[in-house]
UniProtKB/Swiss-Prot annotation:
It comes from Amborella trichopoda. HAMAP family: PSII_PsbB_CP47. It is found in: Plastid, Chloroplast thylakoid membrane. Coiled coil: none annotated. One of the components of the core complex of photosystem II (PSII). It binds chlorophyll and helps catalyze the primary light-induced photochemical processes of PSII. PSII is a light-driven water:plastoquinone oxidoreductase, using light energy to abstract electrons from H(2)O, generating O(2) and a proton gradient subsequently used for ATP formation. One of its GO terms (cellular component) is photosystem II. Binds multiple chlorophylls. PSII binds additional chlorophylls, carotenoids and specific lipids. PSII is composed of 1 copy each of membrane proteins PsbA, PsbB, PsbC, PsbD, PsbE, PsbF, PsbH, PsbI, PsbJ, PsbK, PsbL, PsbM, PsbT, PsbX, PsbY, PsbZ, Psb30/Ycf12, at least 3 peripheral proteins of the oxygen-evolving complex and a large number of cofactors. It forms dimeric complexes. The keyword Chaperone does not apply. GO terms for biological process: photosynthetic electron transport in photosystem II. The keyword ATP-binding does not apply. This is Photosystem II CP47 reaction center protein. One of its GO terms (molecular function) is electron transporter, transferring electrons within the cyclic electron transport pathway of photosynthesis activity.
Length: 508
């Protein structure tokens, strides 16, 4: 046929049977990728430490999505929350992966069938005998069916009426588990961090989709609207479908990057804004303050801080710290976290408690500065020792750990104090194993960062695709060179440009 690569899809332009075939094949590829990727991730996933080596630290991408929909057990006998299971049932991680692969195979066969048997009676216009599709009717059918699926997900799966529910956790990502969710019909349902909004919005959107689908099935579009929006042209469908996809991609890029009830931090890792705002640090200090108010010692109060909460308050888990083109999981960067060393408290020789200024997200290096409770600089690690006034040696800074593995251990030698001051810039201090994975010490992003980058990039690309195909379908006659007001009979093939008598072909 001699088509250039960027025009090959024109072969299905006026061929409804094969248009259906290639869409079924596309579904087969998507489903097959999802199932295969799930099996690969399960093969490399280590479920042994859900606290310090969770799925997002290991770079898992599809396992978090399965988990948030209610899958927690594996045929390997482990549970995502830790511990063992004896009867995971068919809907385990492997069961879902297998179902996707089986579905992919069935779609593959269906696609081949529709490619071979493309000339079906259902695609034929009775009046003309030519292939045609009633696109407004098909739109109504799709709207109705997607409405039913949307309503069913919200009313049955999420609520636990017929299904497992979804992953729900507390604001600090400590107590997450799969549970049923009641719809939130009040103003709280519009809070992106309230799980009940997921149920209520799916029920509401599904109901609207069902009603809209029935409307489009029973009411024909006016002729002027039909012609104005080119409703008979399949490229109109392509353009509006691309619009729906890029809009959804922009939305989910936002909910992933900024955080929401649909993207729990236990499954996808914390957001960069939680580091920027000191979100976990404030909660840790609040808990310690509560402990001290209950007459606990400083050591006892810090020992009650969960390792999970302390681990969130570490810059290495900030998805904005990893470069976009640094391949690999977080564990391949700074290493596998082994244990929390404890919270370091620095003091100078005058007894002031000092706080290390934390590194902002977009800095790779940052000066080590220690300030007191009033924000006054008391010590630092100087760049030029000759001019220093606040060096650790001059000020006599010591460090003592509370909680963690180094509980009640103190250091006064300047080299060790400076080492822990540098590490305190990065949040809570953890022992990291870099040997096992040959980790290079350079931070990586979490699946939260990869998902956002991918979806924002493709959304932008698809936005231009929508503009391109929308313009092509709306101005098709202009691009084809046909004057819509041309009344004269035109002999096709007589002119190089249709309807332009100045371009009459010369007979050789």
């Amino acid at each position: 046929m001699g088509l250039p690569w960027y025009r090959v899809h024109t072969v299905v332009l006026n061929d409804p049977g094969r248009l259906l075939s290639v869409h079924i094949m596309h579904t087969a590829l998507v489903s097959g990728w999802a199932g295969s990727m799930a099996l690969y991730e399960l093969a490399v996933f280590d479920p042994s430490d859900p606290i310090l080596d969770p799925m997002w630290r290991q770079g898992m991408f599809v396992i978090p999505f399965m988990t948030r929909l209610g899958i927690t057990n594996s045929w390997g006998g482990w549970s995502i929350t830790g511990g063992t299971v004896t009867n995971p049932g068919i809907w385990s991680y492997e069961g879902v992966a297998g179902a996707h692969i089986v579905f992919s195979g069935l779609c593959f066969l269906a696609s081949i069938w529709h490619w071979v048997y493309w000339d079906l009676e259902i695609f034929c216009d009775e009046r003309t005998g030519k292939p045609s599709l009633d696109l407004p009717k098909i739109f109504g059918i799709h709207l109705f069916l997607s409405g039913v699926a949307c309503f069913g997900f919200g009313a049955f799966h999420v609520t636990g009426l017929y299904g497992p529910g979804i992953w729900v956790s507390d604001p600090y990502g400590l107590t997450g588990k799969v549970q049923s969710v009641n719809p939130a019909w009040g103003a709280e349902g519009f809070d992106p961090f309230v799980p009940g909004g997921i149920a209520s919005h799916h029920i509401a959107a599904g109901t609207l989709g069902i009603l809209a689908g029935l409307f489009h099935l029973s009411v024909r579009p006016p002729q002027r609207l039909y012609k104005g929006l080119r409703m008979g042209n399949i490229e109109t469908v392509l353009s509006s479908s691309i619009a729906a996809v890029f809009f959804a991609a922009f939305i989910v890029a936002g909910t992933m990057w900024y955080g929401s009830a649909t993207t729990p931090i236990e499954l996808f890792g914390p957001t960069r804004y939680q580091w920027d705002q000191g979100y976990f640090q404030q909660e840790i200090y609040r808990r310690v303050g509560t402990g001290l108010a209950e007459n606990l010692s400083l050591s006892e109060a810090w020992s009650k801080i969960p390792d999970k909460l302390a681990f969130y308050d570490y810059i290495g888990n900030n998805p904005a710290k990893g470069g976009l083109f640094r391949a690999g999981s977080m564990d391949n960067g700074d290493g596998i976290a082994v244990g929390w060393l404890g919270h370091p408290i620095f003091r100078d020789k005058e007894g002031h408690e000092l706080f290390v200024r934390r590194m902002p997200t977009f800095f790779e290096t940052f000066p080590v500065v220690l300030v007191d409770g009033d924000g006054i600089v008391r010590a630092d690690v100087p760049f030029r020792r000759a001019e220093s006034k606040y060096s650790v040696e001059q000020v006599g800074v010591t460090v003592e750990f509370y909680g963690g593995e180094l509980n009640r251990v103190s250091y006064s030698d300047p080299a060790t104090v400076k080492k822990y001051a540098r590490r305190a810039q990065l949040g809570e201090i953890f022992e990291l194993d870099r040997a096992t994975l040959k980790s290079d010490g350079v931070f990586r992003s979490s699946p939260r960062g990869w998902f956002t980058f991918g979806h924002a990039s493709f959304a932008l690309l698809f936005f231009f695709g929508h503009i391109w195909h929308g313009a092509r379908t709306l101005f098709r006659d202009v691009f084809a060179g046909i004057d819509p007001d041309l009344d004269a009979q035109v002999e096709f093939g007589a002119f190089q440009k249709i309807g332009d008598p100045t371009t009459r072909r010369q007979i050789v």
